[in-house]
Amino acid sequence: AQTSLDFKGKKDTSGKLSLMKCTKTYRIVMLPYDNDQQGFVAENFDVRIKGSAALLDYKGDKVKDANGVEQNKPITYVPYNEKLVVNTDGNTEVEGEIIDKALVYDLSSSRMFERKNDVSTRNTDSKEYNDKRIVITDKRTGKEIFNHSLPWFLALCGERTDKGWEDQEYLDRQDHYTLVFYVPSPGSDYHMDARIKVNGWVLNLQNADLGSK
């Protein structure tokens, strides 16, 4: 891809430059198993993205120090908007779902990198740590009801595009994600059913150990 233009004198110069959007946005929609579920308000849940971040160069790659080492630093992204959506007329929809009520959280993050499947990139104390995890906690009990690697399961949607893209290319091309979760009551065993919707594609992670990937 062309990365520069040579401008000489007063003559017009044209060309095509490759651009990359290095920010991502996420809409987290949480639905109750039961519409009369007690305590289903935004203030009772902590939703955040925990991961690493680094300075990026003009190509979107991580800047390395004099020794060629990436300087990843821990970072936490919190919602810039959160609200309870209540059905008052019988026709409320959130991301296409007909519901009585839902919690909606909007977040953003920096560029997401494909997660390598090795110990160093999964160790949060390592400078090579390179992950972003969506973590949902019930504040009433302090229990994490969802903790999973975003690059890992969002890249699964890329496999369904039939574009032949590698995981990193898909993560770069897609800049907005909608994740829909069905949240159990605190008295349950905290097996959460998660339906992740990305541009019409649906992934189901059901009754699994969602904190291990």
What residue ranges belong to the model's regions?
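Short, low-hydrophobicity acidic/polar segments
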Residues: 1-24
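Structural motif
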Residues: 29-40
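Short, structured patches in soluble enzyme cores that scaffold and shape functional sites
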Residues: 21, 30-32, 51
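Tryptophan-paired
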Residues: 40-162
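C-terminal structured domain segments
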Residues: 133-200
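Generic marker of residues within folded, mature protein domains
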Residues: 7, 18, 37, 124-126, ...
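Beta-strand secondary-structure signal
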Residues: 14-16, 25-29, 46, 133-135
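Short, low-complexity, Pro/Ser/Thr/Gly-rich segments in the mature regions of secreted, periplasmic
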Residues: 89-90, 197-213
